[in-house]
């Protein structure tokens, strides 16, 4: 997530709200990802396989991804036919179109979904979007609904808070959002128990918290004692895991690479999950548009950027690669790619949560315990994740700024302002046609998005340094235009006319956070949420992507179908249906600008009234007063 007005954001820690939402369906979560790390959170030395791991060039997709895509295409083809059985396009048989072109998969739509950063706000708003897109959600396949879009997608990417959502879904059985919205104590997504408190274990909370801190400390100490550098990101990642993966012990043995070993993923029954982080070069403090953008997929860790242009086998992170191979006198390492550490890496800005321990209401003795845990961690390492040994050591020596470094430093995936994880989805090798970009960024004074993330990705594509490596992205207007023209108040399509882009580029369906039934603009740094706040924010996220169950536009689901088909219709030289032309007229950015400074952006709910995360009318002075009172307390 991005760094914006931290003082104001921290002040927002105080604001909570009570808002109504239907009870989620209670579904038992069954763990599917494999707890396959040899020694819990501690990376372990193992024998290398007969074919020793190597770093490969990013000139193509990996053989694993290529093979998986062949299987996934069959699943998405079937899912799209189901989707278009309830998403109707007037005077056009969309399901029949998919069926007629199913023998040539390159003709068919290729869909990506990207969930932005923004802390718990992004997780919950993004969860509402995924809930709306999931055909397993009750009533999501009714008229005007978008259920089945998730099943039709090839890729699902997350960044920072969005990575918590993606990780939580995939490690918990590619489960439904309804199942994660449990009301049972001691389970996942119990955000009323903050990171500082830990899960409710059924005892006195102080005792539960003491056990929680001790277990986190022991896990990180095990990694440190094994010779691996640790930072606050390790503690942050372990704490996250209790909320996102396993409330009992935080799932210390679950790895990101284990997703690729599960039967359901090998059968391509779900989209491919991708998590994004930024590289921080030696001696660098600020992350620029030239930063290398790394991805974690189920098989690999690496980047398409020309600086490194390589991928390492994820399962063997922690192994001492040198020049792209493992020296004959070195063993391999497994267990470094802990799920919590991966999610923590993508959200290192939230290390600030842990640094606020003295401002919490926890007993002094617990504060002292946790302060002792953190005392040996230098201030300069507060916001990084340390990947040592550096997998790209002496790899791409002429272009890789970290090639001579024994340690690779990674930071929050939104620190370069690209707060929507579009980077993996716009790579030409992946041939994505349309990206549904869910934006929960806190760009404005009151924590609403204004298109900054899209602007950053567009500007990067034009960067004269060549960091974009030939990737193309649709033209995006400036942030003032977003606000002045209301492009951040409703869905907007970018890249509708593919002939206007410099190269193959997906159509972007921009889905900005907006108050339909709840003020979902919570401060990025608010650490806890009532169950009502959680559920109402998820419900609002559902409304964001369905436009209030199509109440703002009765043809919205049809227009989504048109966006999905757009690039495919071009490839097959199929006439665009008249209703789709009307959709594009309504939702495509027309290229006009209004860059004058806008008035303050304070949207209000447009359906049922609700309480808010940050009340639009509250003044900055009032926020400062409350913040001062909180710090004194």
Swiss-Prot record:
Quote the subcellular location field of this record. Answer: Cell membrane
Q: What is its main location?
A: membrane
GO MF annotations, alphabetized: lysophospholipase activity; phospholipase A2 activity
The answer to whether the entry has keyword Cell membrane is: yes
**Broadest EC class assigned to this enzyme:** hydrolase
Q: Which InterPro entries match?
A: Acyl_Trfase/lysoPLipase, LysoPLipase_cat_dom
Q: Name one GO cellular component term.
A: plasma membrane
Its BP terms in the Gene Ontology are:
glycerophospholipid catabolic process
UniProt induction comment? Induced by lecithin.
Lipid-conjugated positions (GPI-like-anchor amidated serine): 609
Glyco sites are at 64, 104, 139, 173, 246, 290, 329, 358, 397, 450, 463, 469, 497, 500, 521, 549, 555, 594
What Enzyme Commission number does this protein have? 3.1.1.5
For this UniProt record, give its keywords in alphabetical order, as a comma-separated list.
Cell membrane, Glycoprotein, GPI-anchor, Hydrolase, Lipid degradation, Lipid metabolism, Lipoprotein, Membrane, Signal
* Signal peptide annotation: 1-20
Catalysed reaction equations from the record: a 1-acyl-sn-glycero-3-phosphocholine + H2O = sn-glycerol 3-phosphocholine + a fatty acid + H(+)
The entry assigns this protein to a family as follows: Belongs to the lysophospholipase family.
Function as written in the Swiss-Prot or TrEMBL entry:
Catalyzes the release of fatty acids from lysophospholipids.
**Protein's UniProt name:** Lysophospholipase 1
User: Which organism encodes this protein?
Assistant: Aspergillus fumigatus (strain ATCC MYA-4609 / CBS 101355 / FGSC A1100 / Af293) (Neosartorya fumigata)
What gene is behind this protein?
A: plb1
């Amino acid at each position: 997530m991005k760094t914006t007005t931290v003082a104001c954001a921290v002040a927002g820690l105080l604001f909570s709200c009570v808002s109504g939402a239907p009870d989620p369906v209670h579904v038992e979560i069954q763990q599917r990802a494999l707890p396959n790390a040899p020694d819990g959170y501690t990376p372990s030395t193992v024998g290398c396989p007969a074919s020793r791991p190597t770093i490969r060039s990013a000139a193509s997709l990996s053989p694993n991804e290529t093979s998986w895509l062949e299987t996934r295409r069959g699943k998405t083809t079937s899912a799209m036919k189901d989707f278009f059985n309830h998403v109707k396009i007037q005077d056009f048989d969309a399901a029949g179109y998919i069926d007629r072109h199913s023998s040539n998969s390159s003709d068919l739509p290729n869909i990506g979904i990207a969930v932005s950063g923004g802390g718990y706000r992004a997780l919950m708003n993004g969860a509402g979007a995924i809930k709306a897109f999931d055909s397993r959600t009750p009533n999501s396949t009714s008229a005007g609904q978008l259920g089945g879009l998730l099943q039709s997608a090839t890729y699902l990417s997350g960044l920072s808070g969005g990575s918590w959502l993606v990780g939580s879904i995939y490690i918990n059985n590619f489960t439904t959002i309804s199942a994660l919205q449990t009301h049972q104590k001691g389970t996942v997504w119990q955000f009323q128990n903050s990171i500082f408190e830990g899960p409710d274990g059924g005892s006195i909370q102080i005792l539960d918290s003491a056990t929680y801190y001790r277990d986190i400390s022991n896990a990180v100490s095990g990694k440190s004692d094994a010779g691996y550098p640790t930072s606050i990101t390790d503690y942050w990642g372990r704490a996250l895991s209790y909320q996102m993966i396993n409330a009992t012990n935080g799932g210390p043995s679950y790895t990101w690479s284990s997703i690729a070993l599960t039967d359901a993923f090998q059968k391509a029954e779900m989209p491919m999950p991708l998590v994004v982080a930024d590289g921080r070069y030696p001696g660098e403090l600020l992350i620029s548009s030239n930063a290398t953008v790394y991805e974690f997929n189920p098989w690999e860790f690496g980047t398409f950027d020309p600086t490194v242009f390589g991928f390492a086998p994820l399962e063997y992170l922690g192994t001492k690669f040198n020049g792209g191979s493992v020296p004959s006198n070195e063993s391999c390492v497994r267990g470094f790619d802990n799920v919590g550490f991966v999610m923590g890496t993508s959200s290192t800005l939230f290390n600030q949560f842990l640094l606020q321990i003295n401002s919490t209401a926890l007993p002094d003795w617990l504060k002292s315990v946790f302060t002792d845990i953190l005392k040996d961690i230098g201030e300069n390492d507060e916001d990084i994740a340390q990947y040592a040994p550096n997998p790209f050591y002496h790899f791409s020596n002429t272009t890789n700024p970290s090639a001579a470094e024994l340690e690779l430093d990674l930071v929050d995936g939104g620190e370069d302002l690209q707060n929507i994880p579009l980077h993996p989805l716009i790579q030409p090798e992946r041939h994505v046609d349309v990206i549904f970009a869910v934006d929960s960024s806190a760009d404005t004074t009151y924590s609403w998005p204004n298109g900054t993330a899209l602007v950053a990705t567009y500007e990067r594509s034009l960067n004269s340094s060549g960091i974009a490596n030939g990737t193309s992205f649709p033209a995006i207007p400036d942030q003032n235009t977003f606000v002045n023209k209301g492009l951040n108040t409703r869905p907007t399509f970018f890249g509708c006319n593919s002939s206007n882009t410099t190269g193959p580029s997906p159509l972007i369906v921009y889905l900005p956070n907006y108050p339909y039934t709840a003020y979902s603009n919570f401060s990025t740094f608010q650490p806890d949420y009532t169950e009502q706040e959680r559920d109402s924010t998820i419900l609002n996220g559902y409304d964001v992507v369905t436009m209030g169950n199509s109440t703002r536009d009765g043809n919205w689901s049809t227009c989504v179908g048109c966006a999905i088909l757009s690039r495919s219709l071009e490839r097959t030289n199929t006439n665009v249906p008249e209703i789709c032309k009307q959709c594009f007229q309504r939702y495509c950015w027309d290229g006009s600008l209004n860059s004058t400074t806008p008035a303050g952006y304070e949207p209000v709910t447009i359906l049922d009234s609700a309480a808010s995360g940050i009340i639009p009318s509250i003044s900055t002075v009032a926020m400062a007063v409350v913040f001062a009172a909180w710090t004194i307390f």
